[in-house]
UniProtKB/Swiss-Prot annotation:
<protein>
    <recommendedName>
        <fullName>Ribosomal RNA small subunit methyltransferase H</fullName>
        <ecNumber>2.1.1.199</ecNumber>
    </recommendedName>
</protein>
<feature type="region of interest" description="Disordered">
    <location>
        <begin position="260"/>
        <end position="306"/>
    </location>
</feature>
<dbReference type="GO" id="GO:0005737">
    <property type="term" value="C:cytoplasm"/>
</dbReference>
<dbReference type="Pfam" id="PF01795">
    <property type="entry name" value="Methyltransf_5"/>
</dbReference>
<keyword id="KW-0949">S-adenosyl-L-methionine</keyword>
<comment type="similarity">
    <text>Belongs to the methyltransferase superfamily. RsmH family.</text>
</comment>
<comment type="function">
    <text>Specifically methylates the N4 position of cytidine in position 1402 (C1402) of 16S rRNA.</text>
</comment>
<feature type="binding site">
    <location>
        <position position="101"/>
    </location>
    <ligand>
        <name>S-adenosyl-L-methionine</name>
    </ligand>
</feature>
<dbReference type="InterPro" id="IPR023397">
    <property type="entry name" value="SAM-dep_MeTrfase_MraW_recog"/>
</dbReference>
<keyword id="KW-0489">Methyltransferase</keyword>
<dbReference type="GO" id="GO:0070475">
    <property type="term" value="P:rRNA base methylation"/>
</dbReference>
<feature type="binding site">
    <location>
        <begin position="35"/>
        <end position="37"/>
    </location>
    <ligand>
        <name>S-adenosyl-L-methionine</name>
    </ligand>
</feature>
<feature type="binding site">
    <location>
        <position position="108"/>
    </location>
    <ligand>
        <name>S-adenosyl-L-methionine</name>
    </ligand>
</feature>
<dbReference type="InterPro" id="IPR029063">
    <property type="entry name" value="SAM-dependent_MTases_sf"/>
</dbReference>
<feature type="binding site">
    <location>
        <position position="80"/>
    </location>
    <ligand>
        <name>S-adenosyl-L-methionine</name>
    </ligand>
</feature>
<keyword id="KW-0963">Cytoplasm</keyword>
<dbReference type="GO" id="GO:0071424">
    <property type="term" value="F:rRNA (cytosine-N4-)-methyltransferase activity"/>
</dbReference>
Length: 326
């Protein structure tokens, strides 16, 4: 099996259809991972692709694509939230499309030594890059209230207080260093759900999000995409959990000039004339697109995926950040 294709890129056909790559276009694959989206773009059209990934392991896969598509593919090391600065360093200020596949990759989950998996024992790390604090740093140093808040807000763990208390009690005896130890403590507090989801799932998600500042990266990437895309360029985002999708949905609705309706049964009203700037995007599809059953059977990871796509208008980018104020 080719080193670039041991895992399936989620909703690849839908992503390519939404982006509509064309010859001589310049596209950004903000989450290179295993290179599925980049390869799809390069094979679909005679375009150029700039990929971004903070994971050092991506460099080998990127080098293979650079050799296969000389002059058309470049991998930049860094966070996709910094795409504006990364592209500026390459002399690029305008692009035709951005694809973002959010969250942790299957490869990272499969490698126990990366510390993302609660099913395989490994060091309690969870960093997508090599910089910053690890998950072990968080669970061994944060006070109980702060730890509970993280588990609740970023993992939507309803028993966050109980989990945090159990973690603090256990670390008083022996600090955490392995994923299996943390998962065991969590499973001792949280029952397995009826749908079979592992009790450690939500807590591990919360820690991973905080370690890698995933939601902050997403907000920065959305704003950067808005500023970089030329009129007619498209932004396509595939999210895997509700926290990500809420941010993307709110950004899309705001930038498309849609207000939050007072009732889901009433039509959406435009807020473009209510003191807001004109819409910088228009929706490609009215609702989030879900993967086909055929894909979820082959790739169960895709079941929770939600794709949202928008097209850049001719109006200027907003000065308000996706998650902040003007």
């Amino acid at each position: 099996m080719n080193a670039l294709t041991p895992h399936f890129p989620v909703m690849l056909d839908e992503v390519l259809s939404a982006l509509e790559p064309h010859a001589d276009g310049l596209y950004v694959d903000g989450t290179f991972g295993n290179g599925g989206y980049s390869r799809g773009l390069l094979e679909r059209a005679d375009c150029r692709v700039i990929a971004i990934d903070r994971d050092p392991a991506a460099r080998v896969r990127g080098a293979a694509l650079e050799a296969e598509f000389p002059g058309r593919f470049t991998l930049l090391s860094g966070c996709f939230g910094d795409m504006e600065q990364l592209l500026a360093a390459e002399g690029i200020s305008r692009i035709d499309g951005v694809a973002l596949d959010l969250g942790v990759s299957s490869m990272q989950l499969d490698q126990a030594e990366r510390g993302f998996s609660f099913q395989k024992d490994g060091p309690l790390d969870m960093r997508m890059g090599q910089q910053g604090q690890t998950a072990a740093d968080l669970v061994n140093t944060l006070d109980e209230d702060r730890l509970a808040d993280i588990l609740y807000h970023y993992g939507e763990e309803r028993k966050s207080r109980w989990v945090a208390h159990a973690i603090v009690e256990r670390r008083a005896e022996t600090p955490f260093s392995r994923t299996a130890d943390l998962a065991t403590v969590i499973r001792g507090v949280v029952r397995k759900s009826r749908d079979g989801i592992d009790p450690a799932t939500r807590s591990f998600q919360a820690l991973r999000i905080v370690v890698n500042d995933e939601l902050g990266e997403l907000e920065r990437a959305l704003g950067a995409s808005e500023r970089l895309l030329r009129a007619g360029g498209r932004l396509v985002v595939v999210a895997f959990h509700s926290l990500e999708d809420r941010i993307v949905k709110a950004f899309v609705r705001q930038r498309c000039g849609e207000s939050e309706g007072v009732s889901r049964h009433l039509p959406q009203a435009s807020n473009a004339g209510a003191g807001n700037p004109p819409p910088s995007f228009q929706a490609v599809s009215r609702r989030a697109v879900k993967p086909l059953d055929a894909e979820t059977r082959v790739n169960p990871r895709s079941r929770s995926a939600r794709l949202r796509a928008v097209e850049r208008t001719e109006f200027p980018a907003w000065t308000v950040s996706p998650g902040g104020q003007r």
